[in-house]
Regions:
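N-terminal catalytic or cofactor-binding beta/alpha core of small enzyme domains
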Residues: 1-156
């Protein structure tokens, strides 16, 4: 699922509110999956080059970080929950990242990864194309998922 906004109506939608507004399709989606990876954006000046990996599936967070580090060597990847600001950890039980049986990982991307420098705007928004870094993230996450050792992550 995705929450897409236009430039005219930016709104912070707390993840913990999704279930209150979820359609039947979203509710059914969660009945058919074992784990989830959610992608969020955040902005903290002191963390502009840090990708935060929250959520309750810590083994999966470490696995994803190992692939993301290769794809984006200029960024740091924080998977230690104590180093992630409390409100960005993705640990609340109503957060969609924690609904599936194996929970998941909440990937928080800083503005420096979401901003398309060539087109001077936010990636994939209002006619702005996707920034190269966003493609790098997508490709790294795809590789990480394909390399999942299923006996460790999927059968607990």
């Amino acid at each position: 699922y995705g929450l897409i906004q236009t430039n005219d109506d930016p709104l912070h939608f707390p993840s913990t509110k999704l279930n209150e507004y979820a359609t039947e399709n979203v509710k059914e989606f969660f009945q058919h999956i074992k784990l989830v990876i959610t992608i969020h954006g955040y902005g903290r000046e002191h963390l502009f080059h840090s990708v935060l990996l929250g959520g309750r599936n810590r083994a999966l967070a470490s696995h994803l970080a190992s692939f993301l580090k290769i794809a984006l060597p200029d960024y740091s990847f924080v998977s230690d929950l104590e180093e992630i600001p409390k409100e960005l950890r993705g640990l609340h039980p109503k957060n969609p990242v924690n609904i599936p049986p194996l929970a998941g990982v909440q990937v928080e991307l800083p503005p420096t990864l979401r901003w398309n420098r060539e087109e001077w705007g936010w990636s994939d928004n209002g006619g702005i194309g996707r920034a190269k870094h966003v493609d790098d993230i997508i490709n790294a996450l795809s590789k990480a998922i394909k390399a999942l050792p299923q006996n460790i992550y999927l059968n607990r």
